[in-house]
A protein has these predicted regions:
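An amphipathic alpha-helix/helix-turn recognition signal
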Residues: 66-68, 142
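Predominant activation on well-ordered alpha-helical scaffold segments within soluble catalytic domains
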Residues: 35-38, 70-74
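Catalytic strand-loop segment that frames the active site of acyl-thioester-processing enzymes
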Residues: 2-64, 81
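HotDog/MaoC-like acyl-thioester-processing domains
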Residues: 1-15, 102-153
Length: 153
C-alpha cells in the first residue's frame, strides 16, 4: 500500500505548499462498483449500468459515473497525506471539479496530489489539496479537483 506523507505541524503543511505528494496504489473500477454507486445515487443511466446497450454506445462499454470517480478521493487521500496531532479532520468542500476523460469499466485508476494552500481558521487550519486522478494507459486525467479539508487541534 502507498505510504502517505505524514505532517505533524501546521508549519510542515505550510512548508509543503506546491509539493507533489506521490502516487496512490492502482484501483480497478469494476461493474459491481459502478452498479453499487448507481444504486446509492439513483443514477441508473444506461451508459453506466447497461453493458449490452453501452457496447453499441459512444464509449463501447459502460463507464463509471464522474461522481463515482470524485467519490474515490476519500480512498486515495489517506494514501497521500496524513495529518497527525489533531483531534479531527473534516471535509469542507471541493473546488474546480472536472472530468476530462471517461472511465471505462475495468479501468485502473490512481491519484496524485499536491498541497495548494494552507490557511489558519478559528480553532484549526484549512488545507487545500489539488488531486489528479489518472487512468492506466490514458492520455488525460479522468478527474481533477481541489479537496478542501479542515483540521482542528
Amino acid at each position: 500500500m502507498a505510504e502517505p506523507r505524514i505532517f505533524t505541524s501546521v508549519d510542515e503543511l505550510k512548508a509543503a505548499v506546491g509539493e507533489q505528494l506521490g502516487y496512490t496504489d492502482w484501483l480497478e473500477v469494476d461493474q459491481k462498483r459502478i452498479d453499487l454507486f448507481a444504486d446509492a445515487t439513483g443514477d441508473h443511466q444506461w451508459i453506466h449500468v447497461d453493458p449490452e446497450k453501452a457496447a453499441a454506445g459512444p464509449f463501447g462499454t459502460t463507464i463509471a459515473h464522474g461522481y463515482l470517480t470524485l467519490s474515490l478521493l476519500p480512498l486515495f487521500g489517506p494514501q497521500l497525506i496524513a495529518v497527525e496531532g489533531v483531534k479531527m479532520g473534516v471535509n469542507y468542500g471541493t473546488n474546480k471539479v472536472r472530468f476530462p476523460s471517461p472511465v471505462p469499466v475495468g479501468s485502473r485508476l490512481r491519484a496524485t496530489a499536491r498541497i495548494t494552500g494552507v490557511e489558519d481558521v478559528p480553532g484549526g487550519v484549512q488545507v487545500t489539496v489539488a488531486f489528479t486522478v489518472e487512468r492506466e494507459g490514458g492520455d488525460k486525467p479522468v478527474c481533477v479537483a481541489e479537496s478542501v479539508s479542515r483540521y482542528y487541534g
